[in-house]
Amino acid sequence: MPNLDCLEVRFSPFCHDEMLPGTWYEPSSIRMKTLGVISKTLRDRESRPDASIIRELVLNYLEDMPLLKDLKDNLLHNIDKLHIRVVYYNGEIEKSEFASYLSSTLLPSVSEHLVELTIAGLCWGSIPAEFNGQGLSFPCLESLTLEQYIILRQDQFDWILEQRTLINLNLYSCKIVTHCLVQQPDFEDWDVNLDGWKKLPDVSTNMDEANYSHMSHPHLEPLEPGWYMNDLRWSDMFDRIRQNLPLLENFNFRCSSWQNYFEGLPLPHNDDLHNRYYTFDNGSWGWVLYMPADECPRSTERNYFEIKNMPGTPVGLYERTEPADRLALETLMEATRKRCGEK
């Protein structure tokens, strides 16, 4: 295939150290051997004058483990379009080591010449492993796609706003976390950063006290167990995108998966602002705490928010934030359309 310019490496979505009968598990060792063979093939191909250079690489279901330096360098040499969908070992939670490796080693190694970048995973980037691209610079990046990137704080998103060359930005099924139930020692073990969040009072606190304000509870070190809330909203984020990315011409914000935007399956029929916020409690992400208690589809940790109109409640947040979020999104979309029309 002398004219090949794109290569997709598709692994099993299931990671396990053992090959179990009747299952499509793929051990880490086999995955690394596969990548090693592919990287060698790519280097051998470069010595053939009649063969094109492969510049686009798709790593579908890449296991969340660091690559050996030589393997990484050989695999990513000449790549300017990189698309990664991460899978977690044995279906477990994401590893902090890989999030750090991604931001400090893998991405910087290709940052100078990368034109397109896609990162997808399952509720990745915040708890239990934070991805923060602070300091990342992609001077040639024109297109960035993130799927299920979970945002705890504004500074987690600032690295995106610093890529001033972006023309296309796709945020698929990305969420801002508004409420979080801190449980110890898990949060200390995970080193969760809730800087800027406010701790809500214990249930026993008198909610009717005139001097009470949820804004008066600063982030504590270490985090005390209990509920915390975050004031960050998508309206703020949309405004910052519009103000900080002057070349942006195409922006997508909707619930969508890899199969839709990358493999061409029909998009789900839902509102662009559908499920844009998340809560975190008892080790899982969700949106049901935004619903009234009598409409909740399953048993949840709801007793805390059953006091009607209590300060900081997530109940009704989707409805309360919808006008500002929609206006900011429409203003951003109008700005991108205007830029396209001016060309």
Features from the language model and the residues they span:
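Leucine-rich repeat
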Residues: M1-P139, R153-D158
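Leucine-rich solenoid repeat modules
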Residues: P139-K343
